[in-house]
Swiss-Prot record:
Linker: annotated span: 237-251
Domain of life: Eukaryota
GO process annotations (BP): cellular response to amino acid stimulus; proteolysis
Region Domain IV, annotated ranges: 252-422
Protein name, entry field: Calpain-2 catalytic subunit
Sequence similarity: Belongs to the peptidase C2 family.
Protein encoded by which gene: CAPN2
Organism name: Oryctolagus cuniculus (Rabbit)
SUPFAM superfamilies: Calpain large subunit, middle domain (domain III), Cysteine proteinases, EF-hand
Cofactor mode of binding and number, as noted: Binds 7 Ca(2+) ions.
Localization: Cytoplasm; Cell membrane
UniProt keyword Cytoplasm, yes or no: yes
Chain spans, region Domain III: 67-236
Binding site for Ca(2+) 4: 14, 21, 45
Length: 422
């Protein structure tokens, strides 16, 4: 008789057919064997005949539990490291290697393999480890009509010049010029993809992804290793290289002075509403940027950023600085728009922010896309400018409140509310 032992992970219901805990069939088994195999506990673990198993089950999925699940408390050979992450449409859901323009935007994790296996069973030295990529919450999503995503992962060797660093998110050029050292056997729409590898000691980048880009999802990555392996997320540190414009009125040429006098009128200042009209006329002449001008909200936050005297308007010097910034914004927007569509998609936005001097982690890119992209993941020129101005303003405020560069500030309620309505 062939028997199979099964565990119900919820531990509430057990098999009641042949060879269940109370089945008289156990009376025909040697008492010592019966005592060892048939412990009677309501623990969700039970025996059934293999023929009954084949009759009652039509599909078998291997569930990879943690390495110590079926061992005693005193013996745990394999080490487990676990990390949770997510893919977000338009920012961190870059799809597989078939999509080189977006693949690099997937979450990245560094695995440091330091010690070789003690027993080299196949005669080949190296570090043995398993990588399991699990989709989370898919049962919940299935109730909403969504099926499992098709998932997989790639493993890349970290270049020597970048080893030891965890604050650099590897970019598009790296993946265009570097082959994967290992990868999952396949991309498949199962809850978990798991593969076993052996690699020399060193640092490796793990990139989990869905097969196609723009698939929202949460995941868990588990790394099982015979020896301890360091495993952590790789992401850009927050940086802002903001050029402080030190402009005096003597630096402003006569042509710009005449232009300003013509635009500003008798009060010699430009309000947000006047600025909106000016920019509408200027941008209407551009064929390479699709825009109807800038919204009054964007114009107001631009005025607020540069209004040093609190009048709510821009004087000559302030307007000159703003005009220089707008020209810079136009240049970046045009250069990043590689398909010459006159617009920018959310994936191009990450590169545009870097060109503007901002390095941001994935979490912030997710927030920016949610805030400034439309449902087609397009970021128009108005939202692009508004995003840059808000970021610059927030960085400058933080710097003023943190003169010692500690990376932390304290705010009272009124200050928090004032900054929140920017």
């Amino acid at each position: 008789q062939k028997l199979i032992r099964i565990r119900n992970p919820w531990g509430e219901v057990e098999w009641t057919g042949r060879w269940n805990d109370n089945c008289p069939n156990w009376n025909t088994v040697d008492p010592e064997v019966r005592e060892r195999l048939a412990e009677r506990h309501e623990d969700g673990e039970f025996w059934m005949s293999f023929s009954d198993f084949l009759r009652h089950y039509s599909r078998l999925e291997i569930c990879n539990l943690t390495p110590d699940t079926l061992t005693s408390d005193t013996y745990k050979k394999w080490k487990l490291t676990k990390m949770d992450g997510n893919w977000r449409r338009g920012s961190t859901a870059g799809g597989c290697r078939n999509y080189p323009n977006t693949f690099w935007m997937n979450p990245q994790y560094v695995i440091k393999l330091e010690e070789e296996d003690e027993d080299q069973e196949d005669g080949e030295s190296g570090c043995t480890f398993l990588v399991g990529l699990i989709q989370k919450h898919r049962r919940r999503q299935r109730k909403m009509g969504e099926d499992m995503h098709t998932i997989g992962f790639g493993i890349y060797e970290v270049p020597e010049e970048l080893r030891g660093q965890t604050n650099i998110h590897l970019g598009k050029n790296f993946f265009l010029t570097t082959r994967a050292r290992e990868r999952s056997d396949t991309f498949i729409n199962l809850r978990e993809v798991l593969n076993r590898f052996k690699l020399p000691p060193g640092e490796y980048i793990l990139v989990p992804s869905t097969f196609e880009p723009n698939k929202n999802g949460d995941f868990c990555v588990r790394v099982f290793s015979e020896k301890k392996a360091d495993y952590q997320a790789v992401d850009d540190e927050i940086e802002a290289d903001l050029e402080e414009a030190d402009v005096s009125e003597d630096d402003i040429d006569d042509g710009f002075r005449r232009l300003f006098a013509q635009l500003a009128g008798e009060d010699a200042e430009i309000s947000a509403f006047e600025l909106q009209n000016i920019l509408r006329r200027v941008l209407a002449k551009r064929q390479d940027i699709k825009t109807d001008g800038l919204s009054i909200e964007t114009c107001k936050i631009m005025v607020d950023m540069l209004d040093s005297d609190g009048t709510g308007k821009l004087g000559l010097k302030e307007f000159y600085v703003l005009w220089t910034k707008i020209q810079k914004y136009q240049k970046i927007y045009r250069e990043i728009d590689v398909d010459r569509s006159g617009t920018m998609n959310s994936y191009e936005m990450r590169k545009a922010l870097e060109e503007a001097g901002f390095k941001l982690p994935c979490q912030l890119h997710e927030v920016i896309v949610a805030r400034f992209a439309d449902d087609q993941l397009i970021i128009d020129f108005d939202n692009f400018v508004r995003c840059l101005v808000r970021l610059e303003t927030l960085f400058k405020i933080f710097k003023q409140l943190d003169p010692d560069n500690t990376g932390m500030i304290q705010l009272d309620l009124i200050s928090w509310l004032c900054f929140s309505v920017l």
